[in-house]
Amino acid sequence: YSIGYMHHDPDRPRFFAYLSLFTFAMLALVTADNLVQMFFGWEGVGLASYLLIGFWYKKPSANAAAMKAFIVNRVGDFGFALGIFGIFVLFGSVNFSDIFANAATYIPAEGTTGQTVLNFLGYELDKQGAVTAIALLLFMGACGKSAQFLLHTWLPDAMEGPTPVSALIHAATM
């Protein structure tokens, strides 16, 4: 569909380069076996989305939409990055296999008192509080990328890009 739609656009090589970058970043995101690699794919998807939304950069509305998408996604990415850092502090690893293998040790036993395992924004968190805080930070990242609750304002503006971009971004965020 993109080939026919972009056939008469003189900048189609740039469009397909951005589209290839998006595809590469999405593949890096979904095939990652650790959180750092996943984060690089995550950021690549955000960068490629910014480039694709602002493809027609001579239109002020396309530039504004691209900047809005970029900034709102950075808010979610900040939460995601803090969540990854929290996981590293708790588990000492960012590999999914290590995290999943040790996750059961962070389920609080009945009747145990909370030992501080994480200091976050001046709060001393026990195991249960730390896992909850990390889950909320990761959720914040997911909300930013998938245009959910309060971080959704960029998605309607993404229609400023070419139609194939709008379809791709709306499908990728759902």
Q: What residue ranges belong to the model's regions?
A:
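...captures the hydrophobic TM-helix bundle architecture rather than a specific catalytic motif
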Residues: 1-174
